[in-house]
Amino acid sequence: VVLLMASLAVLTACGQQSHSGKAGSNQSVQSKAKDKSVTKSYQLNQKVQGLDQTMTLTVTYAGKKYEKVNIAISQNLPEEAKSALAGQDLSSLQEEVSKSFKQSSGVDKLEQVKGIQVNVKVTEKGTVDIDFIIDPTNLDYDAASKVPTYGPIFNQMKSQTPEEFIKSFQDEGGKEISNPS
């Protein structure tokens, strides 16, 4: 399990850093009452240290105001981690594996920030699925931006409009997809 957690920590950190992008200079401005809520989703398939990773960004916004942001990462486990878990009952290990992963990857520090919820699950298919559910209306941007590895994403959200944030994801290769249910 320690090997698995170390592998996951490195892989997730690399995946998060690849999305840090370039922060824009525009500050978020309160949206007009006429602005309608829009939800857009984008997906980026990439290799991180030779392993397949899918990152899905879903942003709900009205004008220049974020309403909800979800970043979902599905990462293939390294073969040695898959072997270590083979034949084990993942449902009984889920809590322990999730807790260890969160600690080793720094995700546990994000969970302490107001406005962020993180869910981690290791699947039977040999992937780790991480969901970052962000409530921008309650997010402590300053605290989030200080979390190692993940801070640049929150600096980017703070300094960019939702459309600029989405554009930076597209610039990295993100393609629009239908919104997840």
Q: Residues of each region from the PLM?
A:
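C-terminal motif of bacterial Sec signal peptides marking the signal peptidase cleavage site
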Residues: 10-13
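Bacterial signal peptide processing site
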Residues: 15-17
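N-terminal low-complexity, Pro/Thr-rich disordered segments
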Residues: 20-34
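Bacterial N-terminal signal peptides that target proteins for export
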Residues: 1-2
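Subset-of-secretome marker
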Residues: 31-181
